């Protein structure tokens, strides 16, 4: 990958240009940030009896540990993990949209929404989550953090639907 001004060109290992459409880096970073927001909301808020520990571990590659721990503590206090383990409750989060995005000094301040669906037996409940955070660019790590963003600050607010 070669960055020329605001364009990105793709070359193979022999240095030959590959037939790819050049893309505006701002648009590329916006798409990568949207993917990062989606992954962050998913791994922080989606779990069942088999996936809760793995999803928590994955989330720590996407968002700061203190902010992730605060969200995990809320679920623990609300007995969500207990319900998943003992009653088979399933929590699934789906990204909706970016509400606002601004960039200053290499930091991306973003507000976005997602919907958490909680399935507990025959009961289903939906909660809209409004997330706000400041993300920075980092080196991508496969498979933990493929977007190359990391939330330095992050918080969530919940609205019952």
Residue ranges, per PLM feature:
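Structured, amphipathic secondary-structure segments that form assembly/contact surfaces
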Residues: 1-8, 13-31, 45, 50-161
């Amino acid at each position: 990958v070669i960055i020329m001004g605001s364009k990105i060109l793709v070359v193979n290992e022999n240095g030959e240009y590959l037939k790819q459409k050049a893309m505006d880096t701002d648009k590329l970073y916006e798409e990568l940030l949207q993917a990062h927001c989606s992954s962050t909301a998913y791994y922080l808020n989606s779990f069942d009896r088999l996936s809760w520990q793995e999803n928590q571990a994955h989330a720590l590659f996407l968002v700061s540990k203190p902010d992730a721990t605060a969200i995990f503590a809320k679920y623990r206090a609300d007995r969500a993990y207990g319900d998943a383990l003992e009653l088979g409750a399933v929590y699934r989060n789906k990204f909706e949209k970016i509400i606002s995005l601004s960039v200053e000094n290499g930091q991306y301040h973003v507000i976005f929404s997602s919907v958490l669906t909680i399935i507990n037996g025959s009961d289903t409940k939906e909660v809209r989550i409004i997330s706000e955070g400041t993300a920075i660019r980092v080196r991508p790590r496969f498979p933990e953090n493929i977007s190359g963003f990391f939330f330095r600050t992050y918080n969530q607010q919940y609205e019952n639907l």
